[in-house]
From Swiss-Prot:
This is Fructose-bisphosphate aldolase class 1. Belongs to the class I fructose-bisphosphate aldolase family. GO terms for molecular function: fructose-bisphosphate aldolase activity. It comes from Synechocystis sp. (strain ATCC 27184 / PCC 6803 / Kazusa). It is an enzyme of class 4 (lyase). It holds the Pfam family Glycolytic.
Amino acid sequence: MMTLEPNQEQLKKMKSHPGFIAALDQSGGSTPGALADYGIEPNTYSGDDQMFALVHQMRTRIMTSPGFTGDRILAAILFEDTMNREVDGEPTANYLWQNKQIVPILKVDKGLAQEKDGSQLMKPIPQLDSLLMKAKKKGIFGTKMRSFIKHANPAGIEAIVDQQFELAQQIIAAGLVPIIEPEVDIHCSEKAQAEALLKQAMLKHLNQLPKGQWVMLKLTLPEQDNLYSNCIEHANVLRVVALSGGYSQAEANERLSRNHGVIASFSRALTEGLTAQQTDAEFNTMLDESIEKIYQASIT
């Protein structure tokens, strides 16, 4: 089978343009919380259809906001439901790239399995191949998949990294660039040890990748500044991006600015303070200020 290639124009932007990634990919499980933060309480809507319609309105408001452009934002991570919908009458991925010069990325995982060896692997993704084909047709550049590390257990961390890189091969073959996201719990009591084990396991896999195969890494901001510099410099790594992981926007930005070459891929820290009740002017101003702060922290 011929391996498909990623979109070269988007690859070039992801590789060399300053900026960060907006994570707009809360899925079924985290949507009620995201809506509540936005000022829409669960008792004001009923059923998944209404919930997803409301969250799409919220995301549309973000994506169409004047400050939300490719000047400071490299890419946006979308939930599958968002990819299947439209923004301003255009399919979401097209809208982002054609109108905003923002690279579209799709969250592909189906959530986390039960904890084993101090980690949570991803649940199986049975229809991954057909989802990747659909994403490629819709103009998606890359994917994102998250697993979760709670303790510094070598067996658990190795299992997480093995699974991530195995699925990454399937994604690369479909002509997409995978974001590998082995999140380390910010409340982990042995966080620094877990991060050292994670780095070791990732470098082992990265060193086995053939020339020209790209991956991105999405990681918790580490206890030791610049811990992941070897990963940033690795020939197969397009970008190393950081999740906010429950840190406030101020703390996430502060930690990010100390990690040179790492850029943000924030979700909660990006939308902090935005509400449905704000006027468009208030909403756009607050979003623009958040984008600027995260952008500045990303270019250090």
